[in-house]
Amino acid sequence: MVESVLVPVDGSPLSARALSFVSREFPDASVHLLYVVDHVEASYDFDWTSLPGYWDDSPGEATNRGKDVLADARETAENANLTVVAEELAVGRPSSSIVTYATEESVDHVVMGSHGREGLSRFVLGSVAEQVLRRSTVPVTIVR
């Protein structure tokens, strides 16, 4: 029986579909929401304005986006009558962060979208799903 589910979210429509899947298939499970700021993206959070000649129009943008995505995902989950027990914003390699979180928090299942944002990121995030499938020690459901 699945008691806890990790749903990595990125603000894409497939993240919402993953939550919808959880509400249908695991309605009584405790839900963990995870947003991972890619360590490369996080490097842009540095306040470059402190260095002469550099300008950053949005310090902390990646982290702020993560907080917004988590808040939206919580609302979506609660509207689907799911119980959210944790929201985590992590910085690192997305696939490693997802697998590590699933292991450390002893979740029973991971449900995630097959890919996320458009363009080049779509291919990168598609490879994230593949890497999580290969490395996870718990069952993984990929939603399309």
Regions found by a protein language model. Give the residues of each.
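Terminal disorder- and signal-encoded targeting elements
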Residues: M1-L6, A16, F21, V124, ...
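Small/aliphatic-rich secondary-structure junction motif
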Residues: E3-S50
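Short glycine/proline-enriched coil/turn segments at helix->beta-strand junctions
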Residues: E25-S30, L82-T83, V138
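General small-molecule cofactor/ligand-binding pocket signal
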Residues: H32-L34, V85-A90, T141
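A short acidic, glycine-rich active-site loop
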Residues: P52-D68
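Structural beta-alpha unit
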Residues: E75-V110
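Gly/Ser-rich helix-loop-strand patches that form or flank binding pockets
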Residues: E104-R144
